[in-house]
From Swiss-Prot:
Species: Escherichia coli (strain K12)
Keywords associated with the record: Cell inner membrane, Cell membrane, Membrane, Purine metabolism, Symport, Transmembrane, Transmembrane helix, Transport
Cytoplasmic side: 1-34, 80-113, 177-190, 246-265, 328-346, 394-425, 469-484
Protein name: Putative allantoin permease
Record-level Gene Ontology MF annotations: nucleobase transmembrane transporter activity; symporter activity
């Protein structure tokens, strides 16, 4: 391994993109157990639970679907992170095995460039609104600072809270996995306290019976419950399309495959059991108690009389947003941007570039057209499902779990593998799978497929790539060789 690292350094690759040595792979089971809790318990996910009630499913069906989703998510995170934990290599480099050295740039930029940066900016803005609530609870006069002053549509209090929250997120991004790990270790028990406490509060207010009987006003019980049950699972799993693609950005730090597999599985299942119970109890209980459908946990917290309880709950919600932003957005963006010019850019350069772009896009302006921006991001997310299918089929079926690192860390300008650095089979399969999974958003008769788009994209891409891809002497990327 040390000989390989020196060779790759001579080719110009930065330390951040090199394979991790065994001594650098320090993450154990507990590190992975705590990693994703904040990504499960955040404001958009709780709002999503409210959307599930609109489908007309029972409370029990929604809870069961959410819990089952955890097993699908864990399986994909573990399997697509297997190469990372075996070779200590980040996603940006692993992607080269299946799409080619040059071809990897397109799906990589979709994930680490466009989607990650836009979501980073949007999450920073959403978090700044919670931050505004937090400061306003303590210092009401803060909300009127600056009078009518605005900058690019933001009031002075809004601008201050956005910049504060943005800087905190950027700081976590610069710290990378080490800082994130310490942060999530603190966050986890706080999540149990806040969301577990909110669930108990809701049950104590209205009782468990009414919660299980809850149906939003004007909604009829679903007739095609079986398909809608699958739609709920797809919706929960699809949220993880981007993190699952870049799972190797975190599994590269794993001490072993077993530890990342056990840690991620236990962490996600436990997190989603709590989320399933807390989500339906909080949303249904609050809606019954306040006499109106209330699906945003921030709206619920603002109604509380206790200043301390409100302050602590909003603080933890802010922390979950930071955790989600780090694991899902800024860290993958940092690695992917560094991979665009591996001889010139480092991970921290990538974080800085992504952070600045997230400011320049003015996310508060994007939120003025929420439907359009979320449709755009949903389409990008839908493209990543097929990428997962191709990556897993290539690694497990075509290459049988073996990667030739020398062919991933080629010298600049060396595109001898695949067709001038592009795996055309991977791109063809991805295109077909994307059309099948997202076509329903534009073509009416395909609409049922789009409601389970993640499953369609992953399964079609995996099966098609595994069947079409043949190992030839011309295309051997991923074969294990001895490097002299």
């Amino acid at each position: 391994m040390e000989h390989q690292r020196k060779l790759f350094q001579q080719r110009g690759y930065s330390e951040d993109l090199l394979p991790k040595t065994q001594s650098q792979r320090t993450w154990k089971t507990f590190n992975y157990f705590t990693l994703w809790m904040g990504s499960v318990h955040n404001v958009p996910n709780y709002v999503m639970v409210g959307g599930f009630f609109i489908l007309g499913l029972s409370t029990f069906s929604i809870m069961l679907a959410i819990i089952l989703s955890a097993f699908f998510i864990a399986a994909v995170m573990v399997l697509n992170g297997a190469a990372g934990s075996k070779y200590g290599v980040p996603f940006a480099m692993i992607l080269r095995a299946s799409y080619g050295v040059r071809g990897a740039l397109f799906p990589g930029l979709l994930r680490g460039g466009i989607a990650a940066i836009m979501w980073f900016g949007l999450q920073c803005y959403a978090g700044s609104l919670a931050c505004l609530i937090l400061i306003g609870k303590i210092w009401p006069g803060f909300l009127t600072l600056g009078g009518d002053f605005t900058l690019l549509g933001l009031s002075l209090p809004g601008l201050i809270t956005f910049l504060i929250f943005w800087l905190v997120n950027v700081g976590i991004g610069f710290g990378g996995g080490k800082v994130l790990n310490k942060f999530t270790a603190i966050l986890n028990p706080c999540i149990y306290i806040v969301f577990g406490g909110m669930a108990i509060w809701a049950i104590s207010l209205v009782g468990i019976g009414p919660i299980f009987d809850y149906i939003p006003s004007g909604i009829q019980k679903a007739e095609n419950g079986g398909f809608l049950f699958l739609v709920v699972i797809n919706a929960v799993v699809a949220v993880w399309a981007a993190p699952a693609v870049s799972a190797s950005d975190f599994t590269q730090n794993a001490h072993s495959f077993r530890e990342q597999a056990l840690g991620q599985t236990l962490g996600l299942v436990v997190a989603y059991i709590l989320f399933a119970v807390a989500g339906v109890c909080i949303i249904a209980g609050a809606s019954i108690h306040y006499g109106a459908d209330t699906w945003n946990v921030l709206d619920i917290v603002q109604r509380w009389d206790s200043l301390f309880a409100s302050f602590f709950a909003v603080l933890v919600i802010l922390m979950t947003t930071i955790s989600t932003n780090a694991t899902g957005n800024i860290i993958p963006a940092g690695y992917q941007i560094a991979a665009i010019a591996p001889t010139k850019l480092t991970y921290k350069n990538g974080v800085l570039i992504a952070s600045i772009i997230s400011l320049l896009i003015c996310p508060w302006k994007l939120m003025e057209n929420q439907d359009s921006i979320y449709l755009f991001l949903d389409i990008i997310g839908g493209m990543l499902g097929p990428v997962i299918g191709v990556m897993m089929a290539h690694y497990f079926v075509v290459m049988r779990g073996q990667i030739n690192l020398d062919e991933l860390y080629t010298a600049p300008g060396d595109y001898k593998y695949y067709d001038n650095g592009f795996n055309l089979t991977a791109f063809s399969v991805t295109l077909v799978a994307v059309i099948l999974s997202l076509g329903g958003k534009f073509i009416h008769f395909m609409e049922p497929l789009s409601r389970v788009s993640w499953f369609v994209g992953v399964i079609v891409a995996f099966a098609a790539y595994a069947l079409l891809k043949k190992r030839t002497t011309a295309e051997k990327t991923g074969e294990q060789k001895t490097i002299g």
